A protein has these predicted regions:
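Active-site loop/helix belt of alpha/beta enzymes
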Residues: 1-56
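General structural feature for long, well-ordered alpha-helical segments within catalytic domains
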Residues: 3, 30-33, 64, 124, ...
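Short coil-to-beta-strand transition motifs
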Residues: 58-65
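Small-residue-enriched segments and motifs
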Residues: 66-67, 116
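C-terminal accessory subdomain/extension
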Residues: 73-183
């Protein structure tokens, strides 16, 4: 509001006062005079917002459904069909309190798999590792064809990769939402 007041005092009309960012949208105490709030990832939240305390894990609403397509057992890798074309190359959590690699791995139902992260991303393939957790038989735990969900570091960068979203409502019905293109 201070900038708008200074602009107006200089004799320039300033009808629109716009603020941005998800943390601002959630913490603002007084929006008097603000005509627009651009809340960023507010609708979905993401791992960056989770790391700074803006949201809880159960509030993360965007995920990418992926399929296990292979393994490199000697390296401890689970290979999926969701690479950086699906997830983006955003490593926004790498300097935060918890680094999620390229994304947090969950079961198809959305339950976190502790220690499982997307640690590598090629164009079409993601590489999941289980961190320090020792699993003798990755192929048995995550067989080819099994599906997982990946929670993104940055919902904007990931969401922009897709022309539409499949939204699940409280009753379990799936709806398709078309994405608006452009900023």
């Amino acid at each position: 509001m201070h900038a708008a007041e200074r602009i107006r005092k200089a004799g320039i009309a300033c009808a629109d006062v716009s603020i941005g960012s998800t943390p601002t949208a959630l913490s603002a105490q007084n929006l008097d005079g603000v005509t627009e709030v651009r809340a960023g990832v507010y609708v979905f939240f993401d791992l960056v917002m989770h790391n700074i305390g803006v949201c809880q894990t159960e509030e993360l609403a965007l995920s990418v459904l992926t399929t296990v397509i292979g393994h490199q057992l000697a390296k401890g890798w689970i290979i999926t069909d969701a690479g950086w074309m699906a997830m983006s190359r955003d490593r926004g959590t790498q300097r935060q309190r918890h680094d999620f690699g390229y994304g947090q791995v969950c079961s198809e139902a959305g339950d976190w798999i502790d220690g499982a992260r997307v640690t590598g991303a090629n164009q079409e393939h993601g590489i999941i590792t289980l961190g320090d957790t020792c699993h003798a038989d990755l192929a048995a735990l995550f067989p080819i064809g099994s599906r997982l969900r990946i929670l993104p570091n940055h919902a904007c960068a990931t969401g922009a990769q897709f022309p539409h979203y499949h939204a699940l409502d409280a009753n379990g019905a799936v709806h398709t939402w078309s994405r608006l293109h452009g900023w």
